[in-house]
């Protein structure tokens, strides 16, 4: 575990998408980042077992998860919270969400690490005279036993090995559908496997994207 100021986030969130996330979090007044190493992400672990574990040069199976807070605090402050200090409530109220960093680089674009399951607090619901309406899903995270909860819509970047853009879009759509219609949550590779039961011209993994028939087959 490491606690760093938000100003130092560029070494962890880089590339075009990482910079966008950093700008978004700056708008939310992010001040502190807690870096959780060796995080086991369920979605990535399933994708790892289905594809990466059998690759010639298999990557690490653990990810890195970044937790963002609007409150400024030190590592000592966090340790006190872990011991049940009253500062726990302050941490919960300042929680802005998390970003999972996969141990896989996107060498086709900018060489940055792929962004895994990410859930960040939305912008304020009002902006001057305008009212914003967001499609959200309850997102929970546990940091060394401390529970955090925000309402957001999780997303991640496409992973061309197991989940091209259509797969990732389907993965995002499952979150609200799981509440409305009790649709089971699947990992990106599981979505790809289910969708490509419709015969195609290419092998299932690595994924080369879906045809319209594949999208229809999934739903």
Annotate each language-model stretch with its function:
Residues 1-119, 124:
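Long, charge-dense tracts
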Residues 114-142:
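An acidic intrinsically disordered interaction segment
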Residues 131-202:
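Active-site nucleophile-adjacent alpha helix/oxyanion-hole segment immediately C-terminal to the catalytic cysteine
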Residues 204-219:
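Active-site-proximal segments of catalytic enzyme domains
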